[in-house]
From Swiss-Prot:
Fibrinogen C-terminal domain mapped to chain residues: 84-299
Binding site for Ca(2+): 237, 239, 241, 243
Binding site for a carbohydrate: 258-259
Pfam families, per the entry: Fibrinogen_C
Lineage, highest ranks first: Eukaryota, Metazoa, Chordata, Craniata, Vertebrata
Descriptive protein name: Ficolin-3
Disulfide feature: 86-110, 93-121, 245-258
Length: 299
């Protein structure tokens, strides 16, 4: 009987039994024990090697936002020298051109009041140094706007814009400025009109247009009629008509009763889609025959 118990135990011993490894949890494997009564050798097993890590679980839901932090300390006052520097900076695009800025693009000019103003300078046309204050080209910007909008200026630097009546007033307070109007029809034909001087009075005078003599241009003169006229928008009627010209023709301009030019009028995407009143220059294509592209610029 004792032999029957011993043989299986020896068989396990010959097979080597479970492998024993030293780990931190089990620094050594327990040795074999022998039971005196039965002479049976017991081979205790050791803990196996740790398995490989399982896959990372999915992230849990986002927790609620924390409470707002405390308000930071008050910042230091700005440097008043910046105002002085702007007062000493360039006042027009021609001055920038003389300083070596030969590429057309957006620059900063200093207004007489000391404020920096971003403007587009055309450094290529007719000797360069032109400040573009109005541009129409694709109808992406609505020009049927309020008095306050025309006062401040609006639009997109990459497409269409109006620089702003107050900015034009500040710019033309000093020096002599000439005006160039450029027009392009839907067939790509380009014309222009040139005026000796241009100035815009202040808001107290409703941004009245003070225009010099028409000097030259293939487009003819369609702006002299508007010289001496205040600016009119749909919510500020200063024209000489019994009605509001801005409302009638869907624009904003130095209307009389009503116009020979209307370069802030409604945009037409094609000749076939022309409106009764649009971007017109009467001495050019006539009223009701709008232009596809327009630029107004000063130097």
């Amino acid at each position: 009987m004792d032999l029957l118990w011993i043989l299986p135990s020896l068989w396990l011993l010959l097979l080597g039994g479970p492998a024993c490894l030293k780990t931190q949890e089990h620094p050594s494997c327990p040795g074999p024990r022998e039971l005196e009564a039965s002479k049976v050798v017991l081979l205790p097993s050791c803990p196996g090697a740790p398995g490989s890590p399982g896959e990372k679980g999915a992230p849990g839901p986002q927790g609620p936002p924390g409470p707002p932090g405390k308000m930071g300390p008050k910042g230091e006052p700005g440097d008043p020298v910046n105002l002085l520097r702007c007062q000493e900076g360039p006042r027009n695009c021609r001055e920038l051109l003389s300083q070596g800025a030969t590429l057309s693009g957006w620059y900063h000019l200093c207004l007489p009041e000391g404020r920096a103003l971003p403007v587009f300078c055309d450094m290529d046309t007719e000797g360069g140094g032109w400040l573009v204050f109005q541009r129409r080209q694709d109808g992406s910007v609505d020009f049927f706007r309020s008095w306050s909008s025309y006062r401040a200026g609006f639009g997109n630097q990459e497409s269409e814009f109006w620089l702003g009546n107050e900015n034009l007033h500040q710019l033309t307070l000093q020096g002599n400025w000439e005006l160039r109007v450029e027009l392009e029809d839907f067939n790509g034909n380009r014309t222009f009109a040139h005026y000796a001087t241009f100035r815009l009075l202040g808001e107290v005078d409703h941004y009245q247009l003070a225009l010099g003599k028409f000097s030259e241009g293939t487009a003819g003169d369609s702006l002299s009629l508007h010289s001496g006229r205040p600016f009119t928008t749909y919510d500020a009627d200063h024209d000489s008509s019994n009605s509001n010209c801005a409302v009638i023709v869907h624009g904003a301009w130095w209307y009389a009763s009503c116009y020979r030019s209307n370069l802030n009028g409604r945009y037409a995407v094609s000749e076939a889609a022309a409106h009764k009143y649009g971007i017109d220059w009467a001495s050019g294509r006539g009223v009701g025959h709008p232009y596809r592209r327009v630029r107004m610029m000063l130097r």
